[in-house]
């Protein structure tokens, strides 16, 4: 996706039409990409190169809609500076608005992942969350099998409102707090086991980890400690606005992860981007 002609500002002479410039840029980009693909050992026999002008995320999403793509892959190299922090990179915009799964590939990650981490959340146990967890587990299991590697299934849990219980006049005793934590862990562990039992046909073998901590922190720390090659995670925090996935765990993981991330959309997700 080319950014367009904004960078040329008012430098176009009257005898040069914008379309002429677009044609020149398109031909140059097309040749550069095709030359790169020819020299690549991984180039496919059937491959189509398309050049688009406009905002990268929007044009990518419109191509997904037009050609019914099942997956978008993008490198984890994006913009920097204040603008990127305020408005989000192309990767984050794809996570929020793209209708199909999005794979953000870390430059140093292996092409075929051998250590795959599936981040699930069994609570609340609804049909919607079950379907999303099933998609996560199916995808992660397939990726691990392709590489002949290992599948880790992780659920991070925490006691809601714990900080309110430990400070101020109404704080409870350490003993009571510890018992509440123990009960919370028991419930989360049971719900996670129940989920995996319901989905036995989905995964062949996996290493289960139920870890105390907030979702983003547990996923990132586990992936770094265990040297995961790929994190498979769901984007479930949909706002009242159609297609807007704001503040989700997946988004936070993509922003901070040093590992490739594959973000799975929930069933019924509708992108706010209009097709061409």
Regions found by a protein language model. Give the residues of each.
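Structural beta-alpha unit
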Residues: 3, 19-23, 27, 31, ...
